[in-house]
Amino acid sequence: MWCFARRLTHKRWAGAMAGALIAAGFMRFSQSRIATIDIYGTFFILLGAYFMVWYCQSVLQNGVDGSLLPMALGGVAFGLGCASKWTGIYAGAGLAVLYLGVLYARWKQKQPGFWKEFRMAAVGGVAFYIVVPFLIYLASYLPYWWKDPTFGLRDWWDCQTYMYWYHS
């Protein structure tokens, strides 16, 4: 949280204040003691948001070419958030708004070569925010396959539909 607040405000005291506030809140301790997995989802959602803010700031300063690292790290964090709990998928909507918003802001800067950057951002967005998270989500089911080598995509799909119907 310290890094996130510091990146947003560029002030050390704001980072310290955010860190102190998160340390003073006992929700994460309570949730970990009652064995809910929300703390994992929350961590990866915040990590993905941190990398998206870094990406947005980097795009406005360096362009899309110089911003692939935060984009890739954000996609990995998003994938881990989705793999730990479906709530991470909903957080993806917020990430998409930031992602599209920074592309709009970059377009408003009237930089030459914007459409080349836009194509790179679109390919990077699909690769890092759709393909990589999906592969991470699939990898989270490897223990099923290790236990039962006949576990296939149909079984994986049945797990998804069962989770959906259980929660709806």
Stretches found by the model and what they are:
Residues 2-24, 59-69:
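Transmembrane-helix signature of polytopic, membrane-embedded enzymes
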Residues 69, 110-131:
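Membrane-interfacial entry segments at the cytosolic side of transmembrane helices
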Residues 15-23, 50, 78, 82:
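Short helix- or helix-capping micro-motifs
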Residues 30-40, 86-87:
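Short acidic/glycine- and proline-prone juxtamembrane loop motifs at membrane-interface regions
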Residues 87-105:
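Transmembrane-embedded, aromatic-rich helix segments that form part
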Residues 1-10, 49-56, 139:
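Transmembrane-helix signature of membrane-embedded glycosylation machinery that interfaces
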Residues 135-168:
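Aromatic-rich transmembrane-lumenal/periplasmic boundary elements in polytopic membrane proteins
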Residues 48-71, 100-109:
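Membrane-interface transmembrane helices that cradle and orient dolichyl/undecaprenyl
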